[in-house]
Amino acid sequence: MKVLKFGGTSVGSVKSILSLKRIVEKEAESQPVIVVVSALGGITDKLIVTARLALQGDEGWRNEFEAMVDRHHKMIDTIITDTKKREDLFNTVDGMFEQLRSIYYGVFLIHDLSEKTLDAIVSYGERLSSNIVATLISKARWFDARDFIICLLYTSDAAD
């Protein structure tokens, strides 16, 4: 079994994500593969900036948020060619974005952004991109890392 980890640049553009697909599918011909992906390039920073805008009571958080939604939608529209898979993925991704919008709105309303809340916000980057990649790659299945990673301390760098 091989674990392949791809950073944000590897999932940052249509060209790079299609290259990732080729690499994974080639490796999977000879052995089982686990794929770990970062958020789309630049999304982690945008998630944090949007959280800080919401914390400051700046309505601009909504524009930043919509830009993230648009970026993910464009990626999906471009790389997922099967209509049914694309529709299912849009439903999944849009559900996640609705959760994220609610979190941002809560931060905006109460002017509080705990470390735990920021960690939850940032986690959406990887969760969104991993759903996209799992849909793109032939015979792939998506697993939610939260189901099997145990965190002993609740800090931004404490996953074990």
Predicted regions located by residue number:
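Nucleotide/pyrophosphate-binding catalytic subdomain
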Residues: 1-156
